[in-house]
Amino acid sequence: MGKIIGIDLGTTNSCVAVLEGGEAQIIANSEGMRTTPSVVAFTKDGERIVGEPAKRQAVTNADKTITSIKTHMGTDYKVNIDGKSYTPQEISAIILQKLKSDAESYLGQTVTEAVITVPAYFTDAQRQATKDAGRIAGLDVKRIINEPTAAALAYGMDKLDQEKKILVFDLGGGTFDVSILEIGDGTFEVLATAGNNRLGGDDFDQIVIDYLAEEFKKAEGVDLRNDKMALQRLKEAAEKAKKELSSTMSSNINLPFITATAEGPKHLNIDLSRAKFEELTRGLVEKTMEPTKTALQDAGLSTGDIDDVLLVGGSTRIPAVQEAVKKFIGKEPHKGINPDECVAAGASIQAGVLAGDVKDLLLLDVTPLSLGIETMGNVMTKIIERNTTIPTKKSQIFSTAADNQTAVDIHVLQGERSMAYDNTTLGRFQLTDIPPAQRGIPQIEVTFDIDANGIVNVSAKDLGTGKEQKITITSNTNLSEAEIEQKIKEAEMNAEADKQKKEKIEAFNQAESTIYQTEKTLNELGDKISSGEKEDIEKAIADLKAVKDNQDATAEELKKATDEVMTKFQKVSQEMYQKAAQEQQAAQGAEQAQDNGPKDDNVVDADFKEVDEDK
């Protein structure tokens, strides 16, 4: 059986590892480096180059050099090179092929299976895209694992007998995740996760790029961002300065011959201090704190409950980031793991678990966002709540909204808002051939099944006929992860507005149901109810219909009008019930009187006398 490798497919850098002798070994690439830049380039001759060689030639070949493709996974984004379009999956597959090749060179055998990591906040579409990229690269992706969870595995592999609660703070090149885990007795259980998939080292670089470009524009009147070659040089200089400022107090950015004007060549020479860098990027550092607070709240923990803090991703080397985490949690972050390599190491440990090489280790991850379907009134009805342990399977019974409805549309949603249109559509499908019946009679069981990779399967089954329709969610969300993180924030900010909307929808649905049931029962009762009582109820129904048809009516007004109908109808029902009970008692009394009749002495005596005479 071949080895299963562990891959950290990163935004800026990627890494591959394998489990040997019970320990994760990072595999060096063909250039001798332990991490590989996630860069793909196409030369003038059509040759495809990956990693460090691709990064080195980016200045002179900016148009055909692709970076940070991970940020486009799960979208319809295309890269056009020499008239050919490439999807993010294809570009990612090129990087994976490089990592696969390096692993094969190290192991001396063909590699066909892998565990690949993704940000914890990746959507279903992005996870599916990652699996597709692996397949294009010739890899059977045995498991998709969340990056913070993989880091926790690397950290806790030698601490299986210890009980700890850890916070993983993962700030990479393009994404940010924070996860809270509890480890003990060989179990790694994710308690909560939060994040922002549009926040990472690239954003820090961009701020430095803009600062340098603006400073140069002030001095020379030229915007370097309009020159692709100059912009690429700025990008490289900004990244280098950012890294230098993690260990020094100042960095000199010196780019001779950065551009030229009619006056001659122009040079860029700017000193950037750590203090200035921290001032420029303070907003980005602060952005990492909100998801951290959310994760702690969702886990039901306080900062004092955290035993260890793991810093993962190259961007956590920034001193201001480390200081912010230390200040918020109140303890020094753990420095015992390599932030660039621990995710791949953890992936290789999970690969070892799947291969049977690692015993007594159980990983319990969670789904980052709630899943549900659209129900009557555009309401998002959640079936699986966010931070539910996966794999999981949950079902809920629904019914039809109209009489003789023979089909139902299942609109699958992901998000935290109350209204369907405020959430992300994952897919749609239809369950047909439902036997005609009154509304509310058919029983439609909707089941959500999330596998260990976080991939969603949804089915709808008519319990009456056994007919079933299934869908594996593979749809493209066309949505940035910043928008997904925004959904949770919006849900908190708009909680009251959402609550009012939902209450009105529920009141509207209750009103419709009350009207339907009351009118139906009145028709069935016919002349059993007096005309005066019937008119009284019909007037209350008419009043309720008027309120229901008023767009400006509040939930309270709908409830009040609904209660009026129910009160009047219940009063009549009670009177009818009492009348029926009295009639029943009277009938029983008459029957009892008849039963007592044969016990009359004369009758009994006569019967006995006849018998005696015969004898």
UniProtKB/Swiss-Prot annotation:
Expression triggers: By stress conditions e.g. heat shock.
Pfam short name (any one): HSP70
PROSITE patterns, per the entry: HSP70_1 (PS00297), HSP70_2 (PS00329), HSP70_3 (PS01036)
GO molecular function, one term: unfolded protein binding
SUPFAM superfamilies: Actin-like ATPase domain, Heat shock protein 70kD (HSP70), C-terminal subdomain, Heat shock protein 70kD (HSP70), peptide-binding domain
Keywords: ATP-binding, Chaperone, Nucleotide-binding, Phosphoprotein, Stress response
Residue numbers of Phosphothreonine PTMs: 175
Gene3D superfamilies per record: 1.20.1270.10, 3.30.420.40, Actin, Chain A, domain 4 (3.90.640.10), Substrate Binding Domain Of DNAk, Chain A, domain 1 (2.60.34.10)
InterPro entries reported for this sequence: ATPase_NBD (IPR043129), Chaperone_DnaK (IPR012725), Heat_shock_70_CS (IPR018181), HSP70_C_sf (IPR029048), HSP70_peptide-bd_sf (IPR029047), Hsp_70_fam (IPR013126)
Biased composition regions of type Low complexity, renumbered to the chain: 580-594
Positions of the UniProt region annotated as Disordered: 573-615
Bias type Basic and acidic residues, positions: 597-609
Family: Belongs to the heat shock protein 70 family.
Role description: Acts as a chaperone.
Protein name, as recorded: Chaperone protein DnaK
Record gene name: dnaK
